[in-house]
């Protein structure tokens, strides 16, 4: 008999993972700048390795930020507070290599191509995209957060892993960790059970593997994953190498923008390739990806599709997107052409329009840099609002 069930896997990492340290540092610097200079241009990259961090990039701003102080505060908050962890906020070296934004790029952002020969003082019209590129947003009704179940549970487990370390429940845990969840779908594409959960967590040298496995199940997995999704066939792999003492930047170098699938939809939807962290909202890699999620989520919440993927694309120095594409994977209640028409009418997808629509000049980015930019339950980001649902319903009758 043919088995029509399928498996899909996504992963997340904790805030102490080297790549996520880099993301959080880059976004902490961005926030510190935006707090005093909302119009700053920031492209901040971070590299972390044993005993040091390198901060590089292009920043144009009217304010001053003590970058080493921001870096140390961020590392401390994550939990690298002792030299024995292989990374310590007090003793680490911090190198900075910061230039200003290229004037060639700035002229295209400051004055969009469409309005370069006109006397438009309207910022929404005047601002061009900070780069070319394509961005995707996605939503599905398989969870209350409009996220695929595998990435949603991966983030929840990774956050729980960090929480039990920080609150002392499992005080032998260390900051680095990874989680992976495999979901089984039935023939109608509904999630029915968890097939496999993988948890790898850094730990103190003096704790046994058996204790770690028992504690992770009791304090991380069972309180987080709904009981009806786990059965006797569910497989658990907890620290399957047997030992994870050396971790964080001592174990692996980390770099901003290396966890773009963790940051988005866990591989369930397409990705344009651009990362988010360390970029101010004139960079459409970030702001347009947020806008695409905003559009997709409101379409699904309006009942116009069970799942929806939105692609936006831009040319550097040009305000209007060069293309808008929508794919509902056969679940749409109306044609994709009708949806595109409604989106053009009710969403301003020019860079400055996105910034205004989603209020993106706020210093809100550090909290996006771990446990996902989308579908969060611990904080409500502007691109997660469902305030366009009624407008979309009215615009598209079926």
UniProtKB/Swiss-Prot annotation:
User: Mind telling me which PROSITE patterns this protein's record contains?
Assistant: ADOMET_SYNTHASE_1, ADOMET_SYNTHASE_2
What segment(s) does the record annotate as region Flexible loop? 101-111
Q: Give the EC class as a word.
A: transferase
- Its pathway? Amino-acid biosynthesis; S-adenosyl-L-methionine biosynthesis; S-adenosyl-L-methionine from L-methionine: step 1/1
Highest taxon in the source lineage: Bacteria
Could you give a GO molecular-function term held by this entry? methionine adenosyltransferase activity
The UniProt keywords, alphabetically, are: ATP-binding, Cytoplasm, Magnesium, Metal-binding, Nucleotide-binding, One-carbon metabolism, Potassium, Transferase
Q: Name one Pfam family in it.
A: S-AdoMet_synt_C
Q: Where does L-methionine bind?
A: 58, 101, 252, 283
One GO term of the biological process aspect: S-adenosylmethionine biosynthetic process
- Cite the binding residues for K(+): 45
Question: Calcium as a keyword?
Answer: no
InterPro entries given in the database record: ADOMET_SYNTHASE_CS, S-AdoMet_synt_C, S-AdoMet_synt_central, S-AdoMet_synt_N, S-AdoMet_synthetase, S-AdoMet_synthetase_sfam
Q: Which residues bind Mg(2+)?
A: 19
Q: What does the record give as EC number?
A: 2.5.1.6
Catalysed reaction per UniProt?
Answer: L-methionine + ATP + H2O = S-adenosyl-L-methionine + phosphate + diphosphate
Has UniProt tagged this entry with the keyword Transferase? Answer: yes
Q: Which parts of the sequence bind ATP?
A: 17, 176-178, 243-244, 252, 258-259, 279
User: What is the UniProt remark on how the cofactor binds and its stoichiometry?
Assistant: Binds 2 divalent ions per subunit.
Needed cofactors, names only, are: Mg(2+); K(+)
Quaternary organization: Homotetramer; dimer of dimers.
The name this protein carries in UniProt is S-adenosylmethionine synthase
Gene responsible for this protein: metK
């Amino acid at each position: 008999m043919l088995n029509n069930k399928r498996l899909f896997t996504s992963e997340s990492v904790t805030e102490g993972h080297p790549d996520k340290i880099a993301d959080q540092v880059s976004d902490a610097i961005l926030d510190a700048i935006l707090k005093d200079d909302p119009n700053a241009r920031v492209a901040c990259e971070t590299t972390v390795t044993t005993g040091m961090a390198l901060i590089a990039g292009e920043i144009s701003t009217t304010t001053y930020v003590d970058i080493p102080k921001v870096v140390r505060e961020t590392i401390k908050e994550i939990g690298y507070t002792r030299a024995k962890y292989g990374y310590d906020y007090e003793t680490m070296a911090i190198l900075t290599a910061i230039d200003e934004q290229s004037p060639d790029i700035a002229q295209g952002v400051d004055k969009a191509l469409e309005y370069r020969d006109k006397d438009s003082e309207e910022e929404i019209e005047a601002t061009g995209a900070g780069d070319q590129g394509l961005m995707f947003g996605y939503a599905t009704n398989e969870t209350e957060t409009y996220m695929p179940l595998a990435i949603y549970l991966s983030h929840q487990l990774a956050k729980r892993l960090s929480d039990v370390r920080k609150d002392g429940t499992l005080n032998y845990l260390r900051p680095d960790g990874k989680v992976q969840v495999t979901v089984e779908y039935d023939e109608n594409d509904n999630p029915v059970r968890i097939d496999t959960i993988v948890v790898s967590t850094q730990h103190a040298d003096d704790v046994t593997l058996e204790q770690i496995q028992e504690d992770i199940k009791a304090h991380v997995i069972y309180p987080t994953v709904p009981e009806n999704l786990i059965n006797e066939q569910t497989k658990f792999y907890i620290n399957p190498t047997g030992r994870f003492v050396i971790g964080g930047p001592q174990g692996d170098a980390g770099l901003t923008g290396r966890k773009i699938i963790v940051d988005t939809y866990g591989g369930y939807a397409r990705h344009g390739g651009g990362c988010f962290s360390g970029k101010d909202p004139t960079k459409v890699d970030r702001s347009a990806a947020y806008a695409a999620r905003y559009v997709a989520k409101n379409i699904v919440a309006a009942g116009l599709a069970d799942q929806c993927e939105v692609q936006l694309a831009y040319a550097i120095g040009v305000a209007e997107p060069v293309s808008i594409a929508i794919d509902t994977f056969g679940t749409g209640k109306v044609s994709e052409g009708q949806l595109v028409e409604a989106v053009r009418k009710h969403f301003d997808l020019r860079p400055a329009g996105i910034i205004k629509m989603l209020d993106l000049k706020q210093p809100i980015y550090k909290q996006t840099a771990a446990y996902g930019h989308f579908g969060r339950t611990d904080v409500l980001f502007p691109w997660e609002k469902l305030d366009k649902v009624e407008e979309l319903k009215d615009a598209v009758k079926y």
